[in-house]
């Protein structure tokens, strides 16, 4: 059978029509069923116009393989994680292309316990079976069932268990759901907090789910996607802004002045919040930017543990270390009590509680950390020969470096600054992150120097 190019390193993503269509979705469902032989799995889909049809084709493939399907309807990826571990079923699949272009869709697959099915943990096996298409005949008597269910209330219960609602003082929040799947969840949290008497006001923008994305595809990692949130925070005098991508597995925060807060500093903030409640705990972080997280965690009596970037690696490391929390600078936050999975809803709830408990604004909470360890933000360079360019940078700094680490790409540390350079798994791009010890001009100069070396 033909090659299925929609199978990527960690998930399934492809252009609609040729790379991903209902026939391919059916084959993926059959292949998942033949490979894992699950009894019951949960399905959900994001707001994209094709998600429902792809999900139903996937369901048909699973049913034809003898699998019972529970459909939770329109959902974010983390709602599939939650459904999988909460119901104790054998796996789950979310149909989503997150922040990919309009003409794309995709899938994220998990097995029991919401463990990821990634490249070397089953995704290649599912791909092989789907490509071969050599499935046994459908046995009508053994065909799986299909049922629609709602777990929204149980999911909201779980989210609010991470905070004490009575810690919340008067708070005004701008929330930008980007017309993605987050809107109905935000509505449900708002209703629940109101019922509990919490003095939290929600100002909701682009809250209605709309697969045509009239306000652009939501990806607040891109500066051009931040304006609406920033302006709303300033206009309404809000305490904080929250923005989501399409399947809300990432959450992006803005302070009371509408300033975007880099995910790196939120990792430190959440680590501190967890260590106050769980002294001595382990915190997982990625290798791109590390000094702030290490300093915060160590000062709070915790143990920082570095892991390779990427959700499959972070989740596995969290399990082996029994870490309470893990954070990546890309705004992915992982929680032990959430089956070690990432959530875009838990972080903003914790930060909102922290703002109330400390009696400080979000800007005040991160200002000192940003000054102590200024960072470049991730800079992408499209290069013809990434490996040769990285080798050039390493050779240039080899004598000066105090430490070299290859957990993920190349990290080199010096007395007052450090950098990480890594090749993308998915495109011919090299990603650079630079940070310093309280010296913005040094950080900027070294960033410029490395970029010149990469492009020389």
From Swiss-Prot:
Catalyses which reaction? alpha-D-mannose 1-phosphate = D-mannose 6-phosphate
- Name the residues annotated as catalytic in the UniProt entry: 98 (phosphoserine intermediate)
Cofactor binding description: Binds 1 Mg(2+) ion per subunit.
The Swiss-Prot or TrEMBL record lists the needed cofactor(s) as: Mg(2+)
InterPro entries per the UniProt record, alphabetical: A-D-PHexomutase_a/b/a-I, A-D-PHexomutase_a/b/a-I/II/III, A-D-PHexomutase_a/b/a-II, A-D-PHexomutase_a/b/a-III, A-D-PHexomutase_C, A-D-PHexomutase_C_sf, A-D-PHexomutase_CS, Alpha-D-phosphohexomutase_SF
Q: Where does Mg(2+) bind?
A: 98, 245, 247, 249
This entry's Gene Ontology molecular function terms read:
magnesium ion binding; phosphomannomutase activity
* Top-rank EC class of the record's enzyme: isomerase
Q: Could you tell me the keywords of this UniProt record?
A: Isomerase, Lipopolysaccharide biosynthesis, Magnesium, Metal-binding, Phosphoprotein
Keyword Transferase: yes or no?
no
Under which pathway is this protein filed? Nucleotide-sugar biosynthesis; GDP-alpha-D-mannose biosynthesis; alpha-D-mannose 1-phosphate from D-fructose 6-phosphate: step 2/2; Bacterial outer membrane biogenesis; LPS O-antigen biosynthesis
- The record's EC number reads 5.4.2.8
Q: What family does this chain come from, according to its entry?
A: Belongs to the phosphohexose mutase family.
| PANTHER family, alphabetized | PHOSPHOMANNOMUTASE
The free-text function statement in the UniProt record for this protein reads: Involved in GDP-mannose biosynthesis which serves as the activated sugar nucleotide precursor for mannose residues in cell surface polysaccharides. This enzyme participates in synthesis of the LPS O antigen.
Q: State what protein this is by name.
A: Phosphomannomutase
Gene from which this protein is expressed: manB
């Amino acid at each position: 059978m033909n090659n299925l190019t929609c199978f990527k390193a960690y998930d399934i993503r492809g252009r609609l029509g040729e790379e991903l269509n209902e026939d391919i979705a059916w084959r993926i469902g059959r292949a998942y069923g033949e490979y894992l032989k699950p009894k019951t799995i949960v399905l959900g889909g994001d707001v994209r116009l094709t998600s429902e049809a792809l999900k139903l084709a996937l369901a048909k493939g699973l049913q034809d393989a003898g699998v019972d399907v529970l459909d939770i309807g329109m959902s974010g990826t983390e709602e599939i994680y939650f459904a999988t571990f909460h119901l104790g079923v054998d796996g789950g699949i979310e149909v989503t292309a997150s922040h990919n272009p309009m003409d794309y869709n995709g899938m994220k697959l998990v097995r029991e316990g919401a463990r990821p099915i990634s490249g070397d943990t089953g995704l290649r096996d599912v791909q092989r079976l789907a490509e071969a298409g050599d499935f046994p005949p459908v046995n009508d008597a053994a065909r799986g069932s299909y049922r629609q269910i709602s777990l929204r209330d149980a999911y909201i219960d779980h989210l609010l268990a991470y905070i004490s609602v009575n810690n919340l003082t008067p708070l005004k929040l701008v929330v930008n759901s980007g017309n993605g799947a987050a809107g109905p969840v935000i509505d449900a949290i708002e209703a629940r907090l109101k019922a509990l008497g919490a003095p939290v006001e929600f100002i909701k923008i682009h809250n209605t789910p709309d697969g045509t994305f009239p306000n652009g595809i939501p990806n607040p990692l891109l500066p051009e996607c931040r304006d609406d949130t920033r302006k709303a925070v300033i206009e309404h005098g809000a305490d904080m802004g929250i923005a989501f991508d399409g399947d809300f597995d990432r959450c992006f925060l803005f302070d009371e002045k509408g300033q975007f807060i880099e995910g790196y500093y939120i990792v430190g903030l959440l680590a501190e919040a967890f260590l106050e409640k769980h002294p001595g705990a382990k915190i997982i972080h990625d290798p791109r930017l590390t000094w702030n997280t290490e300093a915060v965690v160590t000062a709070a009596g915790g143990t920082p543990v570095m892991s390779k970037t990427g959700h499959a690696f972070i989740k596995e490391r969290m399990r082996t270390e029994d870490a309470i929390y893990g954070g990546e600078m890309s705004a992915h936050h992982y929680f032990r009590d959430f089956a070690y999975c990432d959530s875009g809803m838990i972080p903003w709830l914790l930060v909102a509680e922290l703002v109330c408990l400390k009696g400080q604004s979000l800007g005040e909470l991160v200002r000192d950390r940003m000054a102590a360890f200024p960072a470049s933000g991730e800079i992408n360079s499209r290069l013809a020969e990434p490996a040769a360019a990285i080798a050039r940078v390493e050779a240039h700094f080899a004598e000066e470096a105090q430490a070299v680490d290859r957990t993920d790409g190349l990290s080199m540390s010096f007395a007052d600054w450090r950098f990480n350079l890594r090749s993308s798994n998915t495109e011919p791009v090299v990603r650079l992150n630079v940070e310093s010890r309280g010296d913005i001009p040094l950080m900027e100069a070294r960033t410029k120097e490395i970029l010149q070396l990469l492009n020389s």
